[in-house]
A protein has these predicted regions:
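Extracellular LysM carbohydrate-binding repeats and other cell-envelope/extracellular binding modules
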Residues: 473, 491-523
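Membrane-lipid interaction segments
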Residues: 1-468
Length: 523
């Protein structure tokens, strides 16, 4: 018997391995830089230069890029140092192969840059590398059966979430920022932060729409010695699109966005004065788009007057439990460690770290930390620019009712981000931190079921056929369907409906039916 089959595509996680890299290195202050009095602020990011699979080992090579803002000795001057530390880590793996999509995510768990003496700094970092191997696979399932011998079949509806689009791409943002008229010309950029805020990316027909803001903060030195330290903040909106030929606006997105390159440089304006900032960033995007389908799957087959041999096999499909885009508004207080008198808050910067995610009956219970840096000006002539760091815990429940089975067997992914962050001085050495944290979650459930793989129709033994009753009077039992009754007595559904004058398929318990045997066996 011929079966019409359709293909179901899914992405299956084959292996995930977590490794930690410890970096500890002394850095010499370049000769062109002033002696270091004390570190004000530092930041770092990782660039993975190479990921290569070699048998049962995954080699990851990259660099930790860091920047330091510091107070110089014997002056009120602020200066900066930039550098990088190379690293290479070999991760032992078991199930990864070259055919898999291998993704390595990084996170800076801890970063500490301390002063050894005025010409040397110590840089310590703890990186977590998470290597995940994904396998794209397809499952064939039977939709219908065709044989021309009067076979009867019944189908069921299967809801599946199929992987429709998987791609990696980059989105480049280039803007020029003009200084306001009350700002002096730029001599040297000492510090900058360029962070994405409130990025939204959604699928459309044939493309991906992306929009959001880049939050720019820049400290610079003016061209004249008597000019005090200058800083500015700007929100740079952007919008655009990326080509994705197979995308449709009904698809369910799972998109990870991370800056992989950031730069802010001073440049001349049309009058030849250093009054512009050339801002550039590159966003790396890992895109997975899912399509929810309701498939009609062949569930059972029989043939009146014949023996039917069914061969089945297990098939695993993904089902979307929930997708949720949440925003958590948090307000907390941050205490200063010393009795600084704050004259002005310059800038607040932060990152979100997810510490634990636990599926519950009510949804995903998320515990995390908002790591905050607040740069401010203190009433201290020797070191006016200072920074306070804090770690603010939060807990949030992503509403998504989960069954006991889903809690144990579901796979979930949560992408966190920061949409808004602000700091306000309360007095008494306290700052009020307000933030809007974005939590985009997707919960999938893998369902394994037996599906019909092949059907063979065999002629019934004539003696067996002759022993079947010619006419049967049957009383409908609870849970009976026309299909079950017809299969039990080797009859056809249409014949039962015609003989009993039934207009539909609905039956009532206690209802009486007359079932007539097929006139001849299958041959």
């Amino acid at each position: 018997m011929e079966l019409t089959k359709t293909s179901i595509h899914r992405n299956r996680q084959k292996e995930q391995v977590i490794s930690q890299v410890t970096l500890d290195e002394d850095v010499i202050v370049p000769d062109a830089k002033a002696d270091v009095e004390g570190v004000i602020l530092d930041c770092a990011e990782v660039d993975l230069e190479e990921v290569r699979l070699m048998g049962n080992r995954l080699m990851v090579r990259g660099r930790l890029y860091f920047r330091v803002l510091y107070h110089a000795q014997k002056s009120r001057m602020v200066d900066n140092i930039e550098g990088s530390l190379p690293f290479e880590e070999t991760i032992n793996v078991k199930a990864m192969c070259d055919d898999h999509e291998i993704r390595v995510d990084w996170e800076i768990e801890d970063m500490n840059i301390s002063l050894i003496h005025s010409r040397k700094l110590n840089v310590k970092g703890l990186l977590t590398l998470t290597a995940t191997a994904w396998e794209s696979c397809s499952e064939l399932v039977a939709e219908s059966a065709e044989d021309g011998h009067g076979a009867e079949s019944v189908s069921r509806v299967l809801e599946v979430a199929q992987l429709a689009v998987q791609m990696r791409d980059t989105y480049r943002i280039k803007e020029e920022v003009e200084l306001s008229s009350n700002k002096p010309n730029i001599d040297q950029i000492l510090w900058y932060r360029l962070e994405p805020r409130g990025i939204e990316c959604r699928p459309l027909d044939g493309k991906l729409s992306i929009h959001g803001e880049m939050e720019l903060f820049c400290i610079y030195k003016g061209q004249e010695e008597h000019i005090p330290l200058q800083w500015l903040e700007r929100s740079i909106p952007f919008s655009g699109a990326l080509e994705a030929a197979e995308s449709t606006d009904e698809m369910i997105p799972e998109i990870r966005i991370r800056p992989v390159h950031r730069s802010v440089e001073a440049k001349e304006d049309y009058d030849g004065e250093m009054r512009q900032l050339a801002v550039e960033t590159v966003l790396e995007m890992e895109v997975a788009l899912y399509r929810e389908d309701r498939l009609t799957v062949l569930d059972d087959v029989y043939c009146p007057g014949a023996d039917v041999i069914l061969q089945s096999r297990p098939v695993t499909v993904d089902r979307l439990v929930t997708r949720n885009g949440s925003k958590y508004k948090m307000t907390d207080k941050l205490s200063l460690s010393n009795a600084d008198k704050i004259l002005q808050i310059c800038h607040a910067d932060g990152t979100v770290k997810l510490d634990r995610i636990r599926p519950t009956g009510d949804g995903l219970d998320i515990e995390g930390t908002l790591c905050v840096d607040v740069l401010y000006v203190a009433a201290d002539d020797q070191s006016p620019v200072r920074c306070v760091r804090g770690m603010l815990p939060f807990q949030y429940l992503v509403a998504a009712p989960l069954s006991e089975r889903s809690q144990k067997e579901c796979t979930y992914r949560v992408i966190s981000g920061l949409e808004q962050l602000s700091a306000m001085l309360l007095g008494n050495g306290e700052l009020e931190i307000k933030a809007v944290i974005t939590l985009d979650s997707i919960v999938m459930e893998s369902v394994t079921m037996d599906t019909i793989d092949s059907v063979q129709v065999m002629p019934m033994d004539p003696k067996k056929f002759d022993r079947l009753p010619g006419i049967v009077g049957y009383v409908v039992q609870k849970g009976d369907t026309l299909w079950k009754i017809a299969k039990k007595f080797y009859a056809s559904v249409d014949n039962i409906k015609e003989v009993n004058g039934l207009l539909g398929d609905d039956l009532m318990p206690g209802q009486k039916l007359l079932i007539i045997k097929e006139t001849r066996p299958f041959s």
